[in-house]
């Protein structure tokens, strides 16, 4: 028996809009990765935390049934869960307590290791999965999801598996995810609307002559002005062109912010994570623009950009292996 392949770590992430469970072997092969999107009412721009908690409880029951199929062939040696949104003091959201306590219950019942991480660290680790990035010890990461748009300076701590994460840019008001979702809902799409906006933008053959005005200074972006501009023309233009305008503004905002921050910190590698990073339009256009400045973009597969639990499981594997090495 190959213990590295048969011993697995379970990862759990219960975010604002997705319930996720993953299982990864000690050699970091993905054995299991499933997720369930939370249900959001039609014409709504989000979900209350209390409703999210309720749905996570039901979803974890369903996902754990699927996880049972692993029990005969694999040995669960640890569980790693995202306990809070970000690795800072006072970071808290009720939805994460569901996954945390569910993971605790699994760990206690199986008498295996229990590890904690955060939703943001989960995203970063998942985005590094199968990445060709040259310097994993110091790089920029752009975390852009439903409620977050942050540009992060990620530095490996000395003699540690953990990263030091410093916010060095981002949005000062709403996030890109909020801009995209609000626009999509106004166009009649279900929330979250990113996949519809992305499809529209890719299919739109009309050339943008005058894009939306952007507001970027020292790596920080203001997006409420973009939303106001969209609201003024949303009834006058077709949905595909509106979608293209929105994602074009995402690309141009990020280009301005990232070229500034990259040069300021002397870093030429950027890792992208979060649901907005799954956009094909953003990936293709932003990568091309940054490459002209000798800045290299790393996007993972869409299923690892959007909410998932693979990053949690990877972090769990690293912590488990480090403990095993120290105990030898």
Residue locations for each model-derived region?
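Short glycine-rich, Thr/Ser-proximal phosphate-binding strand/loop in the N-terminal lobe
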Residues: 15-54, 160-167, 299
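A short helix-loop
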Residues: 2-7, 11-15, 22, 31-33, ...
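Active-site nucleophile and cofactor-binding loops and adjacent substrate-binding regions
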Residues: 93-98, 114-121, 142-144, 171-174, ...
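Glycine-rich phosphate-binding/hydrolytic loop that grips phosphoryl groups
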Residues: 123-126, 300-328
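Conserved phosphate-binding catalytic cores of ATP/NTP-utilizing and phosphoryl-transfer enzymes
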Residues: 1-6, 112, 116-140, 314-316
């Amino acid at each position: 028996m190959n213990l590295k392949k048969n011993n697995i770590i379970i990862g759990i992430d219960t975010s604002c809009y997705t319930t996720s469970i993953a299982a990864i072997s000690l050699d970091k092969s993905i054995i299991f990765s499933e997720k369930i999107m939370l249900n959001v009412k039609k014409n709504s721009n989000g979900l209350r935390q209390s409703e999210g908690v309720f749905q996570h409880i039901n979803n974890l029951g369903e996902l754990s049934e699927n996880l049972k199929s692993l029990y005969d062939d694999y040995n669960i040696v640890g569980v790693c869960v995202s306990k809070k949104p970000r690795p800072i003091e006072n970071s808290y959201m009720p939805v994460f307590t569901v996954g945390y306590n569910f993971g605790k219950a699994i760990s206690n019942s199986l008498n295996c290791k229990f590890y904690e991480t955060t939703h943001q660290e989960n995203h970063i680790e998942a985005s590094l999965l199968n990445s060709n990035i040259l310097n994993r010890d110091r790089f920029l990461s752009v975390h852009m999801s439903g409620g977050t748009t942050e540009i992060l300076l990620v530095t490996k701590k000395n003699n540690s598996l953990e990263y030091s994460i410093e916010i060095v840019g981002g949005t000062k008001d709403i996030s890109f995810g909020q801009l995209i979702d609000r626009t999509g809902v106004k166009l009649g799409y279900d929330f979250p609307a990113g996949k519809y906006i992305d499809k529209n933008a890719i299919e739109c053959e009309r050339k943008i002559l005058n894009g939306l005005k952007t507001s970027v200074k020292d790596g920080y972006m203001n997006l409420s002005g973009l939303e106001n501009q969209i609201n003024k023309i949303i009834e006058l233009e077709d949905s595909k062109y509106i979608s293209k305008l929105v994602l074009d503004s995402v690309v141009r905002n990020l280009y301005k912010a990232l070229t500034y921050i990259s040069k300021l910190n002397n870093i030429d590698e950027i890792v992208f994570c979060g649901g907005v990073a799954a956009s094909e339009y953003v990936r293709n256009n932003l990568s091309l623009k940054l490459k002209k400045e000798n800045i290299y973009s790393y996007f993972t597969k869409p299923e690892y950009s959007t909410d998932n639990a693979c990053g949690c499981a990877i972090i769990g594997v690293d912590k488990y292996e480090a403990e095993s090495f120290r105990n030898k």
